[in-house]
């Protein structure tokens, strides 16, 4: 049986647990497992809650170089938000939240942060575009079937003021001084326009036929998987403008936790399957 190798963030994590609804049963199969069943493949799900794109790329690379190439049926990169930072330390994982054991090195763990990444949004986007190209080059070097896509919008949420976590929001419902979002400080006259220019500039270096939803930006005619599966079409230029996300409630865990529930994961798996 061939292997389906996938990495991503909490929307992919097979062990996902809701931080704001801890009693919610999240033991249902996630979209990679559902997709693997459709493809009659063994699922190698490397997804981790809170993961950024360094983790996603690095775990895919490590899995690819250590797996006999004739055993690989398909590789999927499910990219996340650009503001996230991933790093490794030589340390044991004692069950801490957002710390994940390195699959191939028991002395190392992965950690991640949502805020405080070095650089700015323009660098982060260029960094992501380089991951797109590097992942594609790695797969083509070994003649491996692959697809890549943004599970989440890469930068709109950050430009509009990154939302606090669902855990923080739920635990501050009675706090009138609580700010739901971090404030974004613009660096140009139109940061959004400058961000839009970057994927357009790099497009000639990317095999867009193998990129589901390219260029992954709604205003440029692309999309993130979350937007096309878990949200309605009640949007203007971006689903992330303001607080109006327009989630389909039947497909998410709760009013505060926007992660897909069992039906949401089923829809994501079907959406991706139809585009392979």
Where are these regions (language model features)?
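Serine-esterase "nucleophile elbow" of acetyl-processing enzymes
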Residues: 1-57, 61, 66-67
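Alpha-helical cap/lid subdomain in secreted, periplasmic
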Residues: 61-262, 266, 270-276
């Amino acid at each position: 049986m061939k292997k389906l190798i996938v990495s991503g963030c909490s929307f992919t994590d097979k062990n996902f647990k809701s931080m704001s609804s801890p009693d919610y049963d999240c033991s249902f199969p996630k979209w990679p497992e559902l997709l693997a069943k459709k493809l009659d493949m063994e699922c190698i799900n490397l997804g981790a809650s809170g993961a950024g794109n360094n983790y996603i790329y690095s775990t895919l690379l490590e899995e690819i170089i250590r797996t006999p190439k004739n055993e690989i049926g398909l590789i999927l990169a499910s990219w996340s938000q650009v503001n996230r930072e991933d790093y490794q330390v030589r340390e044991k994982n004692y069950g801490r939240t957002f710390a994940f054991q390195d699959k191939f090195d028991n002395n190392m763990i992965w950690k991640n942060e949502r805020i405080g990444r070095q650089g700015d949004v323009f660098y982060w986007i260029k960094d992501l575009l380089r991951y797109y190209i590097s992942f594609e080059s790695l797969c083509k070097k070994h003649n491996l079937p692959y697809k890549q896509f943004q599970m989440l919008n890469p930068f709109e949420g950050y430009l509009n003021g990154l939302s606090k976590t669902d855990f923080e929001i739920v635990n501050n419902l009675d706090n009138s001084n609580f700010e739901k979002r971090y404030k974004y400080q613009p660096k140009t006259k139109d940061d959004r326009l400058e961000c839009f220019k970057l994927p357009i500039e790099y497009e000639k270096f990317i095999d867009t036929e193998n990129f589901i939803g390219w260029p992954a930006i709604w205003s440029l005619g692309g999309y993130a998987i979350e937007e096309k599966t878990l949200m309605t079409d009640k949007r203007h230029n971006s689903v992330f403008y303001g607080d109006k996300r327009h989630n389909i409630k039947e497909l998410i865990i709760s009013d505060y936790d926007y992660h897909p529930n069992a039906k949401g994961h089923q829809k994501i798996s079907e959406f991706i399957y139809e585009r392979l």
